Amino acid sequence: MSTLQDQLDEITARTRELVQAERLAVGERAVEELFASGIEERILPVGSLAPEFALNDSRGRLVRSADMLALGPLIVKFFRGRWCPYCVTELEAWRELHGTLRERGVLMVAISPQTEQQNDFMVSQHALPFAVLRDPGCALAEKFGVAYTVPEYLREYYLSILINVPFVNGEASWRLPLPAIYVISPAGRVLFAEAHADFRVRPEPEEALAAATHST
């Protein structure tokens, strides 16, 4: 059975076959610059007290982290948007583990800066069984240390391939989160934290699930 990273690597391989080298170079430059910024070193580390949050789900209902943590450990997954095939593949991998999450008493939310309508499209199209929350302008992602601003040259590239981030997000900041995952204990402490400047690299869901399970 293929791992999540195997599936993501397949997306990368197909992209390299189909996309012109000069276009690929734009994305590579962005990844290199984001890594060089040191953002991976600034993510909220294990042992920290996680920021509390109250965000709307895809139907406009307010979801509070405190209410979920009262029921057990919480997995928080930050993702860029429904336009990102890597994010879609990762969330679908988590969908397949939803039964295991429930059996182990672990809750999960996915969080993006997309509008509620865009999140609702994603929930419906990919049959996501967990709440998908909106983080306007990546305000919460900033508190977790995983928010960044898309550089001008990458904005032009995105728009050229019909990825209109301001439209999808409903605001003009061009802020996105790193693809990040956190596990938070019922006491509000970070048990697991991983984020990568390279959006093509993601931890296996089982790693985060193991951290959540050990907290129960």
Regions found by a protein language model. Give the residues of each.
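N-terminal targeting signals for export/organelle localization
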Residues: M1-L49
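Short active-site neighborhood of thiol/selenol oxidoreductases, capturing the structured segment around
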Residues: S65-E90, W94
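Structural microenvironment flanking redox-active thiols in thiol-disulfide oxidoreductases
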Residues: E90-K143
